């Protein structure tokens, strides 16, 4: 299995704060996420600025699109994002629209369906049918705060998604100790936000994640 990528989530309240965090690890991470909080605070300009400063990195605009998919996706992609996100509760026509927009670019740009507990496996089949390539298995920030840990149900769902042919990203308070839980699954990306940003040595933490990946994926 290929090595997973490491993605930093920038859910900062300002672009200045996000750029300060990126200055420490931007060259080391594989993927840079302009998080929903940062997008709300700074708008699409945050995507433009980060894409300009890090042209060789994959950029995700975590818009959690729920409607008006064509407009949002074109806006984020034109600003420099390679990937965007659509929330799993979005209607199927919205999901189809975001895929269509991404397919109009060369090379193709992709939208990840961000999954919460509010989905059905019938929906998953429909996403596959309309051309979705990526999904994000998401343990919510509020669930983390309530002490909810990764469960067998989570792991089984992630494996099922990978078996269906999706490129699967895992997020939700990921720590170094969590990586081993997913060792038998071809994970595409692990997202770490506060685990990296709040570390005493963020660069070392990124390297530790990569070291963990090398233990379990070849």
UniProtKB/Swiss-Prot annotation:
It comes from the Bacteria. The record marks 64, 67 as: Transition state stabilizer. PANTHER family: 3-KETO-L-GULONATE-6-PHOSPHATE DECARBOXYLASE SGBH-RELATED. This is Probable 3-keto-L-gulonate-6-phosphate decarboxylase. Pathway: Cofactor degradation; L-ascorbate degradation; D-xylulose 5-phosphate from L-ascorbate: step 2/4. Its cofactor is Mg(2+). Its EC number is 4.1.1.85. Keywords: Carbohydrate metabolism, Decarboxylase, Lyase, Magnesium, Metal-binding. Substrate binds at residues 11, 194. GO terms for molecular function: 3-dehydro-L-gulonate-6-phosphate decarboxylase activity; metal ion binding; orotidine-5'-phosphate decarboxylase activity. NCBIfam families: PRK13306.1 (NF009832). Binds 1 Mg(2+) ion per subunit. It comes from Mycoplasma pneumoniae (strain ATCC 29342 / M129 / Subtype 1) (Mycoplasmoides pneumoniae). Catalyzes the decarboxylation of 3-keto-L-gulonate-6-P into L-xylulose-5-P. Is involved in the anaerobic L-ascorbate utilization.
């Amino acid at each position: 299995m290929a090595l997973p990528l490491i993605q930093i989530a920038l859910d900062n309240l300002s672009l200045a704060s996000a750029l300060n965090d990126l200055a420490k690890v931007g060259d080391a991470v594989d993927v840079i996420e302009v998080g929903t909080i940062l997008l709300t605070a700074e708008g699409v300009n945050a995507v433009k600025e980060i894409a300009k400063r890090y042209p060789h990195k994959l950029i995700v605009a975590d818009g959690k699109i729920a409607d008006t998919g064509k407009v949002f996706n074109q806006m984020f992609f034109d600003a420099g994002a390679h990937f965007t996100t659509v929330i799993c509760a979005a209607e199927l026509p919205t999901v189809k629209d975001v895929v269509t927009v991404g397919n109009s670019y060369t090379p193709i740009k992709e939208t990840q369906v961000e999954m919460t507990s509010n989905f059905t496996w019938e929906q998953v089949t429909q996403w596959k049918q309309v051309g979705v390539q990526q999904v994000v298995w998401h343990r919510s920030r509020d669930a983390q705060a309530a002490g909810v840990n990764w469960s067998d149900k989570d792991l089984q769902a992630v494996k099922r998604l990978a078996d269906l042919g999706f490129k699967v990203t895992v997020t939700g308070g990921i720590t170094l100790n969590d990586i081993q839980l997913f060792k038998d699954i071809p994970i595409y990306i692990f997202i770490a936000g506060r685990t990296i940003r709040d570390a005493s040595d963020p660069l070392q933490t990124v390297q530790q994640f990569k070291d963990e990946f090398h233990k379990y994926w070849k």
